Amino acid sequence: SPSGRKLRTTLICVQFVVSIVLIIGACFVQIQNSYMRNFSLGFDKDQVAIVELNETMYNKHHDTYVNRLKENPGIEDVAFAMEKVGSKDGYNTNGGSYKGKDFQYFIIIASSNFLRVMGIPVIEGRDFSKADELSDHVSYIFNRTAMEGLDMQVGDAFDSYSSGHLIGFSDDVKFTSLRGGEDNIAFLVGNFGYSLPISYIRLKAGSDIHAVVGHIQETMRELDPSYPFNIEFYDEIFNHLYRKEENLRDLVTVFSLLAIIISLVGVFGLVVFETQYRRKEIG
């Protein structure tokens, strides 16, 4: 009947609208994920391998570990930190006050060569030195966001976490996902007596990654054979950090494909029905 035909046409149109909305949503999610993966993080994440050591090995053998790794010509340098940066949405946080302003900041306690190994530029003041690691007074390097937001100055005393001085400022880095905004970040170097179990291994450009990974594995088995170590690169770390977004993209894509298939089946069914209806009218 004419009313039935109108209803069928309306339903097909609704299916097409739903399909188009889902396709647009899938495209938007894909663009968003691509943007997050290609966003400039402020540090050189390529050619960096990360290996977590147990505290005993770090305390006893970290110098041997570095020297043994650097025997491979594909390894440029090795740095250490307490945190695996870039892997989560929050880090050790401290509250402080500067020139009467209260603020929160992430604390990254690291070795003196950490910024250089990670490719983080110092924009004002100086970088950490080996002497800073031996000092009982902490050397602080804050990021640009903290420097500009709090009007920080090189040479100022700072004792929010431990007594020390501001020796410089780095460019902004993004160690959390893009779900949040810019964070105040402080890099700290000093004679804390803490273990820094996360090792950052900078590979030279053009090095044989498989050979380097094999050398790292051999070194770990030699120095700490019972420890179940894992070698990570930032591609893997970001896959974990943005897993929710990846799952959403996959889910929207699947529903979009299902909606398209259902719409095509509906159109095919409508064509078949109309053909049969016309035949009956002619007959």
Where do the protein language model's features map onto the residues?
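Hydrophobic secondary-structure segments that place a key small or acidic residue at a functional site
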Residues: 104-184
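Alpha-helical transmembrane segments of integral membrane proteins
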Residues: 1-54, 249-269
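Membrane-interface helix-boundary signature
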Residues: 4-11, 242-252
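"Rare, low-scoring activations can occur
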Residues: 60, 64-77, 144-148, 152, ...
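Transmembrane alpha-helix boundary/anchor motif
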Residues: 24-31, 233, 262-266
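Intracellular coupling helices
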Residues: 1, 265-283
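Membrane-proximal extracellular/periplasmic loop immediately following the first transmembrane helix
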Residues: 31-96, 101-102, 107
